[in-house]
C-alpha cells in the first residue's frame, strides 16, 4: 500500500484470505527494541492520564469505593486504548505488506516507522483488550453492580445477594442460548471451528448494534451542540427549558424521599427501643439526610384502624427499605447538584448577555465603552484579568465553538460518506480514508491521520453514553456519579471498544488488498461465520446503513417526537421546547435569582479545566459557597448542618426521670433516659434519696407491696431477713460494689430483699465496666433468668 513499493507479480502475490490466520505468508520475527518499548510505555502513560482526567469529570475519588474506581479505570482504559492501537495496527499492517511485496528484510527500502511496534506485541494488546473486556463485562461488572445496589447490612450478605442475582440471570441466558444453538445446528451443519467463530460473531453483533446507535447519534449531536454554544441566546433558551425539567424532577424526588423517611419514622416508632431488629433500624436511620430531621421528628403516623395489625418486621423487609432509601438519597443528591449547576450556568449566561446588551447601548461613547470592558457577575467576583475574561466571553468563545462545530461537521460528513461507500460501493477508491492510507508512507504522519478520525469517533460514541439516562437506573452526574452508574458506563464502554475499532478498520479497507491479516482481524476474526451465502457476504455491511438511518432520526429529532407522542416518560427526553416552556423556565430562573440574592447566591460551576487544575494543584474553591463575599467567587451563605444526636433520631422523646442515689461514684444516664445522680449533702439528704430509688425499683420489678419501701430506717430488720442469703456463692458485684467490703447476694425470687441488702450499705458505686446495669433492671432482666457474672 506504500507509494514507493514495486508492483508485485501475479506469481509472487499470495491470494488474499478471509481467514483470521496469517495464511501462507510468514511474518518475519521481530524483536522489540528499546525505542519501541519506550514509545509503548509513553502511550500507556498518556492513555492512563487521559482516562484519569475523564473519570474525574464524573466521579468523586473520595466518595467512590476503591473497588469501583479500580475496575472502572480498567474499563475506561481499555476503551480509550483503541485510539492509539488502531493507528498502530494500520501502520504495522501497511509496513509488513510493503516488506512482503518487495521480498525484503525489515531493514530494506521499507523504512521502519518511528512509532512502529512488532506485530506480536500489537496482537497481544488486542488479545488483552478482547478477553479482558469479556471478563469485565460478563463476570466482574455485573456482580459489582448488584453488590453496589444491595441493601443488606453485612458484607457477606451483599456478596451473596449479588452472586445469587447474577447466577439466576445467567441461568436463564444459558437456557435461552442453548435453545438457540440447538435450533441453529438443526438448520445448518457446522464444524467446531465454524461454531466458535459463530459464537464470537454473535458476541460482536451486540456491540456492533450498540456502536451504530451511539455513534450515529453522536455524529449529529456533537456538531450541533458545538454550534449551539456559539450563540449565547441559544444557550440561554436551552437552559430555560432544562430549568423546567430539573425543577420538576427535584420536587418529585424530594417528595418521594420525604414520604419514605416518614415510613421509616413510622416503622421506628412502632418497633420500639428493644425490638430485635432495632440495630438494623438504627443503621437505616443513620443514613437518612439530616436536613429533614426537624420535619420528620414532628411527624406522627395515624393509628392503625381497629382490627388491623402492623406489618411484622423482617430482615428482608428492612433490606428493601434500606435499598430504597439509598436510591432515593442518591437521586435527590444528583437532582440537587444538576439543578445548582444549571442555575450557576444560567445566571452566568444572563450576566454575559446583559453585558453584551449594555455594550450595544454604549457603543457610541468610546470612553464609557472602554471603562466597562468587564463582565458584571451577579454571584461571583471578576477575576484579576477581567479584560481577557471579557474578550473571551464576548468574542473568542462564540467563534471558538463555531469553528470547532464546523470542523466536526466536516469530520462527520467524511465518516458518513465512508460508511456509505462501505455499504453500497464495491470500489474502495471512493473512500477518503482508503485513498489517504494508500498514498501516505507508514510513519508518524499516517498515525496522526488515523488518530484524528479515530478519536473523533470515540468522542461521538462515548459522549452519547455519557449523556444517556435510563430512567432512574443509570445516569452520570458531573463529579457526583454513584457507584452503579460509574461501573455501568465502564461496562458498556468496554463493549463499544472492539466494534468501534472494527468499524474504523472496515471503512479504511485495511484488509482489502493485503496478503496478510491485520493483528486486529487475527484476534477478532472477520465476522463471516455465516458462510458464503448472501447473508454472510453482506452481514458486515448492514450496520453502516443502519447507522445512516440513526443519523437521519437524530438530525430531525424524530426520537423526541415519537417519545412525546407516545408519552414514554421513562425515556426522560425533553420534548417540550415550545415558547411556553421557555417562558416557564424564565419565571423559574427569575424567582431563583431573587431568592438566591437574599440567601447567599449560587456556587459557581466548576469548568473542566478547573477540575483538571485541582488534580495537580490540590486547590479547592470553585463550586463551593463561602461565607465572605470577598472570597473566591463571592457566593456566600455556606450551609452548616446542625449537630444532631444520632442516637435519638426518628425516636419519640423519652420522659426523663431524675433519681438520686447516695454516694454514687458518677452521674449515670441510662438508655431509657433516666438520670441517676449522687447526693453528698449529708445523711439527711442521703436517707431521703432511699425512698425514691426504692419506690422506683419496686415499680420496675413488679413488687405490689409498699411495706418494704417504708422500712428504710430499720436496717436491722432487713439484715435479719437476708442473713440466710449472705452465704450464697452468687455475687452481685457486677452491679453494685462496696467501698469497704465485698458481699454476696443471693439468687432468689425476693427481688426487694436483693435491692434492700445493697441499699443498706449506703456506700456503693457503679462499676465502669458494665454501663447497661440499670437498663437491665428497668427491663426486668435482672434477677431470675439472668446469669450472674463472676
UniProtKB/Swiss-Prot annotation:
One GO cellular component term of this record is: cell periphery
Q: Which residues form a coiled coil?
A: 236-266
Q: Which GO terms describe its biological process?
A: cell migration; chemotaxis; endocytosis; pseudopodium organization
Q: Where in the cell is it found?
A: Membrane
Q: Where is the composition biased (Low complexity)?
A: 1-21, 706-734
The record's Pfam families line, in alphabetical order, gives: LMBR1
- Signal peptide extent: none
Looking at the record, which segments are called Disordered? Answer: 1-22, 630-665, 701-751, 765-790
Does the record carry Cell cycle as a key word?
no
Per UniProt, the ranges with Acidic residues bias are 766-778
Can you tell me where the transmembrane regions are? 34-54, 66-86, 128-148, 167-187, 195-215, 401-421, 442-462, 539-559
Membrane topology qualifier: Multi-pass membrane protein
Keyword annotations for this protein, in alphabetical order, are: Coiled coil, Membrane, Transmembrane, Transmembrane helix
What InterPro entries would the database entry show?
GPCR-associated_LMBR1 (IPR051584), LMBR1-like_membr_prot (IPR006876)
Q: Which PANTHER family match?
A: G-PROTEIN COUPLED RECEPTOR-ASSOCIATED PROTEIN LMBRD2, LMBR1 DOMAIN-CONTAINING PROTEIN 2 HOMOLOG B
Q: What is this protein called?
A: LMBR1 domain-containing protein 2 homolog B
Q: What organism is listed for this UniProt entry? A: Dictyostelium discoideum (Social amoeba)
The upper taxonomy is: Eukaryota, Amoebozoa, Evosea, Eumycetozoa, Dictyostelia
Amino acid at each position: 500500500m506504500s507509494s514507493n513499493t514495486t508492483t508485485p507479480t501475479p506469481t509472487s502475490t499470495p491470494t488474499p484470505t478471509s481467514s483470521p490466520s496469517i495464511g501462507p505468508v510468514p511474518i518475519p520475527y521481530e524483536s522489540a527494541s528499546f525505542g519501541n518499548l519506550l514509545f509503548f510505555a509513553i502511550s500507556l502513560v498518556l492513555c492512563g492520564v487521559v482516562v484519569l482526567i475523564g473519570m474525574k469529570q464524573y466521579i468523586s475519588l473520595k466518595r467512590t469505593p476503591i473497588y469501583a474506581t479500580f475496575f472502572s479505570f480498567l474499563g475506561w482504559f481499555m476503551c480509550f486504548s483503541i485510539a492509539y492501537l488502531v493507528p498502530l495496527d494500520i501502520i504495522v499492517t501497511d509496513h509488513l505488506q510493503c516488506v512482503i511485496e518487495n521480498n525484503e528484510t525489515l531493514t530494506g527500502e521499507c523504512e521502519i516507522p518511528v512509532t512502529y511496534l512488532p506485530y506480536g506485541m500489537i496482537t497481544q494488546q488486542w488479545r488483552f483488550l478482547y478477553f479482558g473486556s469479556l471478563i469485565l463485562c460478563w463476570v466482574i461488572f455485573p456482580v459489582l453492580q448488584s453488590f453496589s445496589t444491595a441493601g443488606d447490612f453485612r458484607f457477606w450478605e451483599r456478596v451473596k445477594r449479588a452472586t445469587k442475582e447474577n447466577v439466576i440471570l445467567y441461568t436463564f441466558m444459558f437456557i435461552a442460548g442453548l435453545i438457540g444453538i440447538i435450533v441453529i445446528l438443526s438448520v445448518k451443519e457446522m464444524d467446531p471451528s465454524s461454531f466458535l467463530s459463530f459464537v464470537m460473531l454473535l458476541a460482536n453483533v451486540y456491540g456492533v448494534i450498540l456502536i451504530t446507535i451511539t455513534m450515529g447519534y453522536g455524529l449529529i449531536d456533537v456538531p450541533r451542540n458545538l454550534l449551539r454554544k456559539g450563540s449565547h441566546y441559544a444557550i440561554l433558551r436551552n437552559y430555560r427549558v432544562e430549568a423546567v425539567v430539573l425543577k420538576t424532577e427535584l420536587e418529585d424526588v424530594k417528595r418521594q424521599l420525604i414520604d419514605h423517611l416518614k415510613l421509616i419514622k413510622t416503622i421506628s416508632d412502632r418497633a420500639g427501643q428493644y425490638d430485635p431488629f432495632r440495630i438494623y433500624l438504627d443503621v437505616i436511620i443513620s443514613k437518612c439526610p439530616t436536613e429533614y430531621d426537624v420535619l420528620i421528628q414532628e411527624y406522627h403516623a395515624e393509628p392503625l384502624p381497629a382490627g388491623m395489625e402492623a406489618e411484622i418486621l423482617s430482615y428482608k423487609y428492612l433490606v428493601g427499605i434500606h435499598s430504597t432509601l439509598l436510591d432515593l438519597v442518591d437521586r435527590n443528591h444528583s437532582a440537587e447538584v444538576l439543578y445548582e449547576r444549571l442555575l450557576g450556568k444560567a445566571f452566568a449566561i444572563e450576566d454575559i448577555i446583559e453585558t453584551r446588551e449594555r455594550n450595544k447601548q454604549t457603543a457610541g461613547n468610546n470612553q464609557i465603552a472602554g471603562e466597562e470592558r468587564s463582565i458584571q457577575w451577579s454571584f461571583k467576583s471578576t477575576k484579576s484579568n477581567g479584560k481577557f475574561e471579557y474578550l473571551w466571553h464576548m468574542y473568542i468563545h462564540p467563534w471558538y465553538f463555531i469553528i470547532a462545530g464546523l470542523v466536526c461537521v466536516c469530520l462527520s460528513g467524511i465518516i458518513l460518506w465512508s460508511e456509505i461507500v462501505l455499504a453500497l460501493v464495491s470500489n474502495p477508491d471512493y473512500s477518503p480514508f482508503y485513498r489517504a492510507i494508500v498514498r501516505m508512507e507508514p510513519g508518524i504522519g499516517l498515525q496522526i491521520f488515523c488518530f484524528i478520525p479515530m478519536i473523533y469517533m470515540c468522542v461521538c460514541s462515548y459522549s452519547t453514553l455519557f449523556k444517556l439516562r435510563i430512567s432512574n437506573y443509570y445516569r452520570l452526574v458531573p463529579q457526583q456519579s454513584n457507584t452503579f452508574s460509574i461501573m455501568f458506563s465502564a461496562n458498556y464502554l468496554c463493549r463499544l471498544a472492539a466494534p468501534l475499532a472494527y468499524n474504523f478498520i472496515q471503512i479504511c479497507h485495511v484488509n482489502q488488498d493485503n496478503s496478510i491479516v491485520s493483528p486486529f482481524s487475527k484476534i477478532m476474526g472477520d465476522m463471516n461465520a455465516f458462510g458464503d451465502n448472501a447473508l454472510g457476504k453482506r452481514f458486515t455491511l448492514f450496520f453502516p446503513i443502519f447507522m445512516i438511518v440513526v443519523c437521519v432520526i437524530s438530525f430531525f429529532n424524530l426520537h423526541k417526537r415519537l417519545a412525546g407522542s407516545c408519552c414514554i416518560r421513562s425515556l426522560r427526553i425533553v420534548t417540550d421546547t415550545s415558547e411556553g416552556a421557555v417562558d416557564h423556565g424564565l419565571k423559574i430562573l427569575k424567582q431563583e435569582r431573587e431568592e438566591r440574592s437574599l440567601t447567599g447566591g449560587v456556587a459557581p460551576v466548576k469548568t473542566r479545566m478547573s477540575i483538571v487544575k485541582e488534580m495537580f494543584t490540590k486547590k479547592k474553591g470553585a463550586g463551593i459557597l463561602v461565607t465572605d463575599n470577598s472570597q473566591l467567587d463571592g457566593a456566600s451563605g455556606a450551609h452548616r448542618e446542625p449537630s444532631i444526636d444520632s442516637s435519638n433520631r426518628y425516636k419519640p422523646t423519652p420522659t426523663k426521670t431524675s433519681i438520686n442515689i447516695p454516694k454514687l461514684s458518677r452521674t449515670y444516664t441510662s438508655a431509657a433516659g433516666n438520670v441517676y445522680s449522687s447526693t453528698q449533702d449529708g445523711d439527711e439528704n442521703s436517707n431521703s434519696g432511699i425512698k425514691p430509688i426504692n419506690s422506683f425499683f419496686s415499680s420496675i420489678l413488679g413488687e405490689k407491696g409498699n411495706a418494704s419501701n417504708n422500712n428504710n430506717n430499720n436496717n436491722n430488720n432487713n439484715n435479719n431477713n437476708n442473713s440466710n442469703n449472705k452465704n450464697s456463692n452468687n455475687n452481685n458485684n457486677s452491679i453494685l460494689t462496696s467501698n469497704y467490703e465485698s458481699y454476696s447476694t443471693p439468687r432468689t425470687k425476693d427481688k426487694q430483699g436483693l435491692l434492700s441488702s445493697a441499699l443498706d450499705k449506703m456506700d456503693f458505686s457503679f462499676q465502669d465496666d458494665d454501663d447497661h446495669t440499670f437498663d437491665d433492671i428497668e427491663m426486668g432482666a435482672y434477677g431470675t433468668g439472668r446469669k450472674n457474672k463472676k
